[in-house]
Amino acid sequence: MVNVRQPRDVAQILLSVLFLAIMIVACLWIVQPFILGFAWAGTVVIATWPVLLRLQKIMFGRRSLAVLVMTLLLVMVFIIPIALLVNSIVDGSGPLIKAISSGDMTLPDLAWLNTIPVIGAKLYAGWHNLLDMGGTAIMAKVRPYIGTTTTWFVGQAAHIGRFMVHCALMLLFSALLYWRGEQVAQGIRHFATRLAGVRGDAAVLLAAQAIRAVALGVVVTALVQAVLGGIGLAVSGVPYATLLTVLMILSCLVQLGPLPVLIPAIIWLYWTGDTTWGTVLLVWSGVVGTLDNVIRPMLIRMGADLPLILILSGVIGGLIAFGMIGLFIGPVLLAVSWRLFAAWVEEVPPPTDQPEEILEELGEIEKPNK
Protein backbone atom coordinates (compact mmCIF):
# COMPACT_ATOMS: atom_id res chain seq x y z
CA MET A 1 0.00 0.00 0.00
CA VAL A 2 1.36 3.39 -1.00
CA ASN A 3 1.53 6.00 1.76
CA VAL A 4 0.05 9.15 0.24
CA ARG A 5 0.50 11.18 3.40
CA GLN A 6 2.80 14.11 2.77
CA PRO A 7 5.72 14.53 5.17
CA ARG A 8 5.63 17.55 7.40
CA ASP A 9 7.62 20.50 6.14
CA VAL A 10 9.00 22.02 9.35
CA ALA A 11 10.35 25.08 7.59
CA GLN A 12 6.98 25.77 5.97
CA ILE A 13 5.18 25.49 9.30
CA LEU A 14 7.66 27.81 11.04
CA LEU A 15 7.48 30.38 8.27
CA SER A 16 3.67 30.27 8.28
CA VAL A 17 3.54 30.80 12.05
CA LEU A 18 6.13 33.59 11.80
CA PHE A 19 4.16 35.29 9.03
CA LEU A 20 0.92 35.13 11.05
CA ALA A 21 2.69 36.46 14.15
CA ILE A 22 4.16 39.38 12.18
CA MET A 23 0.76 40.21 10.69
CA ILE A 24 -0.93 40.13 14.11
CA VAL A 25 1.76 42.32 15.71
CA ALA A 26 1.62 44.76 12.79
CA CYS A 27 -2.17 45.04 13.00
CA LEU A 28 -2.03 45.63 16.76
CA TRP A 29 0.67 48.24 16.25
CA ILE A 30 -1.48 50.08 13.71
CA VAL A 31 -4.65 50.07 15.83
CA GLN A 32 -2.84 50.70 19.14
CA PRO A 33 -3.82 54.41 19.31
CA PHE A 34 -7.48 53.45 18.97
CA ILE A 35 -7.67 50.45 21.32
CA LEU A 36 -8.50 52.36 24.51
CA GLY A 37 -11.03 54.58 22.76
CA PHE A 38 -12.72 51.59 21.15
CA ALA A 39 -12.76 49.63 24.41
CA TRP A 40 -14.30 52.62 26.19
CA ALA A 41 -16.87 53.03 23.42
CA GLY A 42 -17.74 49.34 23.56
CA THR A 43 -18.29 49.57 27.31
CA VAL A 44 -20.51 52.64 26.95
CA VAL A 45 -22.55 51.17 24.09
CA ILE A 46 -23.14 47.83 25.81
CA ALA A 47 -24.17 49.56 29.04
CA THR A 48 -26.55 52.00 27.32
CA TRP A 49 -27.90 49.77 24.55
CA PRO A 50 -31.33 49.34 26.24
CA VAL A 51 -31.62 53.14 26.41
CA LEU A 52 -30.94 53.38 22.67
CA LEU A 53 -33.65 50.83 21.89
CA ARG A 54 -36.18 52.73 24.01
CA LEU A 55 -35.32 55.99 22.29
CA GLN A 56 -35.69 54.30 18.93
CA LYS A 57 -39.22 53.18 19.84
CA ILE A 58 -40.12 56.68 21.03
CA MET A 59 -38.80 58.19 17.78
CA PHE A 60 -40.98 56.01 15.56
CA GLY A 61 -38.29 53.41 14.92
CA ARG A 62 -35.74 55.83 13.44
CA ARG A 63 -32.28 54.66 14.44
CA SER A 64 -30.56 57.80 13.13
CA LEU A 65 -32.44 60.10 15.51
CA ALA A 66 -31.83 57.76 18.44
CA VAL A 67 -28.09 57.65 17.66
CA LEU A 68 -28.00 61.47 17.47
CA VAL A 69 -29.71 61.83 20.85
CA MET A 70 -27.41 59.26 22.49
CA THR A 71 -24.33 61.00 21.07
CA LEU A 72 -25.51 64.33 22.48
CA LEU A 73 -26.08 62.67 25.86
CA LEU A 74 -22.53 61.29 25.80
CA VAL A 75 -21.22 64.78 25.03
CA MET A 76 -23.12 66.14 28.04
CA VAL A 77 -21.89 63.38 30.33
CA PHE A 78 -18.22 63.25 29.29
CA ILE A 79 -17.06 66.22 27.20
CA ILE A 80 -18.76 69.12 29.01
CA PRO A 81 -17.64 68.09 32.56
CA ILE A 82 -14.04 67.64 31.37
CA ALA A 83 -14.12 71.06 29.69
CA LEU A 84 -15.43 72.64 32.90
CA LEU A 85 -12.73 70.85 34.89
CA VAL A 86 -9.95 72.15 32.63
CA ASN A 87 -11.38 75.67 32.81
CA SER A 88 -11.56 75.47 36.61
CA ILE A 89 -7.94 74.29 36.85
CA VAL A 90 -6.67 77.01 34.53
CA ASP A 91 -8.60 79.78 36.30
CA GLY A 92 -7.75 78.66 39.82
CA SER A 93 -4.18 77.43 39.59
CA GLY A 94 -2.59 80.81 38.79
CA PRO A 95 -3.87 82.79 41.79
CA LEU A 96 -3.31 79.80 44.09
CA ILE A 97 0.34 79.33 43.13
CA LYS A 98 0.93 83.10 43.27
CA ALA A 99 -0.53 83.34 46.79
CA ILE A 100 1.54 80.39 47.98
CA SER A 101 4.82 81.57 46.48
CA SER A 102 4.44 85.19 47.61
CA GLY A 103 3.69 84.28 51.19
CA ASP A 104 0.30 85.93 51.31
CA MET A 105 -1.38 82.87 52.82
CA THR A 106 -2.11 83.38 56.51
CA LEU A 107 -3.97 81.30 59.03
CA PRO A 108 -7.52 82.57 59.74
CA ASP A 109 -8.79 83.99 63.01
CA LEU A 110 -11.59 81.38 63.44
CA ALA A 111 -13.82 83.70 65.44
CA TRP A 112 -16.74 81.28 64.99
CA LEU A 113 -15.13 78.95 67.53
CA ASN A 114 -16.56 81.21 70.25
CA THR A 115 -20.08 80.25 69.18
CA ILE A 116 -19.58 76.58 70.09
CA PRO A 117 -21.28 75.83 73.43
CA VAL A 118 -19.22 74.85 76.50
CA ILE A 119 -15.86 74.32 74.75
CA GLY A 120 -15.89 77.20 72.25
CA ALA A 121 -13.94 79.68 74.37
CA LYS A 122 -11.23 77.13 75.17
CA LEU A 123 -10.89 76.14 71.52
CA TYR A 124 -10.61 79.78 70.47
CA ALA A 125 -7.98 80.50 73.13
CA GLY A 126 -6.01 77.37 72.20
CA TRP A 127 -6.05 78.30 68.52
CA HIS A 128 -4.71 81.79 69.21
CA ASN A 129 -2.05 80.37 71.51
CA LEU A 130 -0.95 78.21 68.57
CA LEU A 131 -0.81 81.26 66.32
CA ASP A 132 1.18 83.24 68.90
CA MET A 133 3.65 80.34 69.29
CA GLY A 134 4.51 80.23 65.60
CA GLY A 135 1.60 80.01 63.26
CA THR A 136 3.59 82.02 60.71
CA ALA A 137 6.55 79.69 61.11
CA ILE A 138 4.28 76.71 60.53
CA MET A 139 3.02 78.20 57.27
CA ALA A 140 6.60 79.00 56.23
CA LYS A 141 7.61 75.36 56.65
CA VAL A 142 4.51 73.95 54.99
CA ARG A 143 4.43 76.45 52.10
CA PRO A 144 7.23 74.85 49.98
CA TYR A 145 5.55 71.45 50.12
CA ILE A 146 2.17 72.96 49.26
CA GLY A 147 3.68 74.78 46.31
CA THR A 148 5.47 71.67 45.01
CA THR A 149 2.34 69.56 45.36
CA THR A 150 0.15 72.15 43.66
CA THR A 151 2.62 72.56 40.80
CA TRP A 152 2.70 68.78 40.31
CA PHE A 153 -1.08 68.55 40.15
CA VAL A 154 -1.26 71.40 37.68
CA GLY A 155 1.42 69.72 35.59
CA GLN A 156 -0.68 66.57 35.43
CA ALA A 157 -3.36 68.60 33.67
CA ALA A 158 -1.26 68.19 30.52
CA HIS A 159 -2.57 64.63 30.31
CA ILE A 160 -6.07 66.03 29.85
CA GLY A 161 -5.25 66.61 26.18
CA ARG A 162 -4.66 62.91 25.57
CA PHE A 163 -7.78 62.09 27.52
CA MET A 164 -9.80 64.46 25.34
CA VAL A 165 -8.49 62.66 22.24
CA HIS A 166 -9.72 59.37 23.68
CA CYS A 167 -13.05 61.04 24.45
CA ALA A 168 -13.36 62.11 20.82
CA LEU A 169 -12.53 58.60 19.63
CA MET A 170 -15.04 57.20 22.11
CA LEU A 171 -17.78 59.43 20.71
CA LEU A 172 -16.93 58.46 17.12
CA PHE A 173 -16.80 54.72 17.82
CA SER A 174 -19.92 54.91 19.99
CA ALA A 175 -21.91 56.50 17.17
CA LEU A 176 -20.73 53.80 14.76
CA LEU A 177 -21.51 51.01 17.22
CA TYR A 178 -24.95 52.45 17.95
CA TRP A 179 -25.62 52.56 14.21
CA ARG A 180 -24.45 48.99 13.45
CA GLY A 181 -24.58 47.38 16.87
CA GLU A 182 -26.49 44.26 15.87
CA GLN A 183 -24.07 43.42 13.05
CA VAL A 184 -21.03 43.98 15.28
CA ALA A 185 -22.50 41.82 18.06
CA GLN A 186 -23.32 39.05 15.60
CA GLY A 187 -19.77 39.16 14.23
CA ILE A 188 -18.26 38.93 17.72
CA ARG A 189 -20.51 36.00 18.63
CA HIS A 190 -19.63 34.27 15.36
CA PHE A 191 -15.91 34.70 16.03
CA ALA A 192 -16.28 33.43 19.62
CA THR A 193 -18.26 30.41 18.41
CA ARG A 194 -15.52 29.67 15.88
CA LEU A 195 -12.94 29.73 18.67
CA ALA A 196 -14.72 27.77 21.42
CA GLY A 197 -18.11 26.62 20.14
CA VAL A 198 -21.06 27.14 22.46
CA ARG A 199 -18.76 28.10 25.33
CA GLY A 200 -17.38 30.97 23.28
CA ASP A 201 -20.86 32.33 22.58
CA ALA A 202 -21.77 32.00 26.26
CA ALA A 203 -18.57 33.82 27.22
CA VAL A 204 -19.52 36.79 25.01
CA LEU A 205 -23.00 36.99 26.56
CA LEU A 206 -21.57 36.77 30.10
CA ALA A 207 -19.09 39.52 29.25
CA ALA A 208 -21.92 41.79 28.11
CA GLN A 209 -23.79 41.15 31.38
CA ALA A 210 -20.68 41.94 33.42
CA ILE A 211 -20.11 45.21 31.53
CA ARG A 212 -23.69 46.31 32.13
CA ALA A 213 -23.41 45.31 35.79
CA VAL A 214 -20.32 47.46 36.30
CA ALA A 215 -21.95 50.40 34.55
CA LEU A 216 -25.02 50.13 36.75
CA GLY A 217 -23.42 49.21 40.05
CA VAL A 218 -20.34 51.42 40.00
CA VAL A 219 -20.45 54.21 37.44
CA VAL A 220 -24.12 55.19 37.77
CA THR A 221 -23.98 55.26 41.57
CA ALA A 222 -20.75 57.30 41.52
CA LEU A 223 -22.13 59.82 39.04
CA VAL A 224 -25.40 60.28 40.95
CA GLN A 225 -23.68 60.84 44.28
CA ALA A 226 -20.97 63.09 42.83
CA VAL A 227 -23.39 65.26 40.86
CA LEU A 228 -25.66 65.74 43.87
CA GLY A 229 -22.65 66.48 46.06
CA GLY A 230 -21.35 68.96 43.47
CA ILE A 231 -24.69 70.74 43.44
CA GLY A 232 -24.46 71.09 47.21
CA LEU A 233 -20.94 72.51 46.95
CA ALA A 234 -21.94 75.03 44.28
CA VAL A 235 -25.04 76.19 46.14
CA SER A 236 -23.08 76.53 49.40
CA GLY A 237 -20.53 78.77 47.71
CA VAL A 238 -17.53 76.45 48.07
CA PRO A 239 -14.80 77.47 45.58
CA TYR A 240 -13.57 75.07 42.89
CA ALA A 241 -16.83 73.13 43.02
CA THR A 242 -16.20 71.59 39.58
CA LEU A 243 -12.79 70.28 40.57
CA LEU A 244 -14.16 68.92 43.84
CA THR A 245 -16.99 67.21 41.95
CA VAL A 246 -14.46 65.37 39.79
CA LEU A 247 -12.61 64.34 42.96
CA MET A 248 -15.91 63.08 44.33
CA ILE A 249 -16.42 60.96 41.22
CA LEU A 250 -13.00 59.38 41.80
CA SER A 251 -13.76 58.86 45.48
CA CYS A 252 -17.10 57.22 44.69
CA LEU A 253 -15.54 55.02 42.01
CA VAL A 254 -13.06 53.60 44.53
CA GLN A 255 -15.99 52.97 46.90
CA LEU A 256 -15.03 55.63 49.46
CA GLY A 257 -18.14 57.69 48.81
CA PRO A 258 -18.48 61.48 48.56
CA LEU A 259 -17.82 62.25 52.24
CA PRO A 260 -13.99 62.45 51.97
CA VAL A 261 -14.55 65.53 49.78
CA LEU A 262 -17.68 66.94 51.42
CA ILE A 263 -16.42 66.84 55.02
CA PRO A 264 -13.38 69.11 54.35
CA ALA A 265 -15.72 71.49 52.50
CA ILE A 266 -18.01 71.62 55.54
CA ILE A 267 -15.02 72.29 57.80
CA TRP A 268 -13.90 75.07 55.45
CA LEU A 269 -17.33 76.75 55.60
CA TYR A 270 -17.28 76.73 59.41
CA TRP A 271 -13.64 77.84 59.30
CA THR A 272 -14.54 80.95 57.29
CA GLY A 273 -17.47 81.75 59.59
CA ASP A 274 -20.25 80.78 57.17
CA THR A 275 -22.05 78.57 59.68
CA THR A 276 -25.44 78.72 57.94
CA TRP A 277 -24.26 77.23 54.66
CA GLY A 278 -21.97 74.90 56.59
CA THR A 279 -24.99 73.45 58.38
CA VAL A 280 -26.95 73.21 55.12
CA LEU A 281 -24.09 71.37 53.44
CA LEU A 282 -23.75 69.12 56.49
CA VAL A 283 -27.37 68.01 56.21
CA TRP A 284 -27.11 67.64 52.42
CA SER A 285 -23.93 65.57 52.81
CA GLY A 286 -25.77 63.20 55.12
CA VAL A 287 -28.44 62.69 52.47
CA VAL A 288 -25.95 62.20 49.63
CA GLY A 289 -23.70 59.94 51.70
CA THR A 290 -26.54 57.55 52.54
CA LEU A 291 -27.98 57.58 49.03
CA ASP A 292 -25.70 54.70 48.14
CA ASN A 293 -27.65 52.45 50.52
CA VAL A 294 -30.81 53.15 48.52
CA ILE A 295 -29.41 52.91 44.99
CA ARG A 296 -27.15 49.90 45.50
CA PRO A 297 -29.86 47.34 46.43
CA MET A 298 -31.90 48.39 43.41
CA LEU A 299 -28.93 47.84 41.12
CA ILE A 300 -28.05 44.54 42.77
CA ARG A 301 -31.46 43.22 41.82
CA MET A 302 -30.64 44.25 38.24
CA GLY A 303 -27.54 42.10 38.19
CA ALA A 304 -24.87 44.45 39.52
CA ASP A 305 -23.81 42.34 42.51
CA LEU A 306 -20.01 42.31 42.19
CA PRO A 307 -17.39 41.83 44.93
CA LEU A 308 -16.15 45.06 46.50
CA ILE A 309 -12.49 44.06 46.21
CA LEU A 310 -13.04 43.46 42.48
CA ILE A 311 -14.40 46.96 41.93
CA LEU A 312 -11.74 48.61 44.10
CA SER A 313 -8.87 46.74 42.42
CA GLY A 314 -10.28 47.47 38.96
CA VAL A 315 -10.64 51.20 39.58
CA ILE A 316 -7.22 51.71 41.18
CA GLY A 317 -5.37 49.32 38.86
CA GLY A 318 -7.10 50.73 35.80
CA LEU A 319 -6.22 54.29 36.83
CA ILE A 320 -2.55 53.35 37.24
CA ALA A 321 -2.39 51.29 34.03
CA PHE A 322 -4.49 53.34 31.60
CA GLY A 323 -4.95 56.74 33.21
CA MET A 324 -8.39 58.32 33.61
CA ILE A 325 -9.92 55.96 31.04
CA GLY A 326 -8.88 53.07 33.29
CA LEU A 327 -11.45 54.23 35.85
CA PHE A 328 -14.07 52.76 33.52
CA ILE A 329 -12.12 50.04 31.68
CA GLY A 330 -10.37 48.54 34.73
CA PRO A 331 -13.49 47.37 36.63
CA VAL A 332 -15.02 46.13 33.36
CA LEU A 333 -12.03 43.93 32.53
CA LEU A 334 -11.90 42.41 36.01
CA ALA A 335 -15.68 41.94 36.11
CA VAL A 336 -15.68 40.16 32.74
CA SER A 337 -12.80 37.91 33.83
CA TRP A 338 -14.57 37.21 37.13
CA ARG A 339 -17.83 36.24 35.44
CA LEU A 340 -16.08 33.98 32.92
CA PHE A 341 -14.01 32.33 35.65
CA ALA A 342 -17.09 31.80 37.83
CA ALA A 343 -19.01 30.30 34.89
CA TRP A 344 -16.10 27.94 34.17
CA VAL A 345 -15.94 26.80 37.81
CA GLU A 346 -19.71 26.27 37.98
CA GLU A 347 -19.54 23.74 35.13
CA VAL A 348 -18.38 21.20 37.74
CA PRO A 349 -20.60 20.51 40.78
CA PRO A 350 -19.08 21.42 44.16
CA PRO A 351 -17.64 18.59 46.30
CA THR A 352 -20.13 16.95 48.65
CA ASP A 353 -17.86 14.53 50.54
CA GLN A 354 -16.64 15.46 53.99
CA PRO A 355 -12.94 16.34 54.30
CA GLU A 356 -12.42 13.53 56.85
CA GLU A 357 -13.72 10.92 54.39
CA ILE A 358 -11.44 12.19 51.64
CA LEU A 359 -8.42 12.04 53.95
CA GLU A 360 -9.31 8.49 55.05
CA GLU A 361 -9.58 7.31 51.45
CA LEU A 362 -6.28 8.97 50.64
CA GLY A 363 -4.63 7.22 53.59
CA GLU A 364 -5.98 3.81 52.49
CA ILE A 365 -4.58 4.36 49.01
CA GLU A 366 -1.13 5.32 50.33
CA LYS A 367 -0.81 2.36 52.79
CA PRO A 368 -0.25 -0.41 50.17
CA ASN A 369 2.42 1.70 48.49
CA LYS A 370 4.55 1.84 51.65
UniProtKB/Swiss-Prot annotation:
InterPro entries referenced in this protein's UniProt entry, alphabetically: AI-2E-like
Pfam short name (any one): AI-2E_transport
Parts of the chain that traverse the membrane: 18-38, 40-60, 66-86, 107-127, 157-177, 214-234, 249-269, 275-295, 309-329
GO terms under cellular component: plasma membrane
Periplasmic side: 1-17, 61-65, 128-156, 235-248, 296-308
Cytoplasmic side: 39, 87-106, 178-213, 270-274, 330-370
Keyword Magnesium: no
Topological relation to the membrane, as annotated: Multi-pass membrane protein
Taxonomy, superkingdom: Bacteria
Cell compartments where the protein resides: Cell inner membrane
Sorted UniProt keywords: Cell inner membrane, Cell membrane, Membrane, Transmembrane, Transmembrane helix, Transport
Keyword Transport part of the UniProt annotation: yes
Family as reported in the entry's similarity comment: Belongs to the autoinducer-2 exporter (AI-2E) (TC 2.A.86) family.
Protein name as annotated: Putative transport protein YdiK
Species per Swiss-Prot/TrEMBL record: Escherichia coli (strain K12)
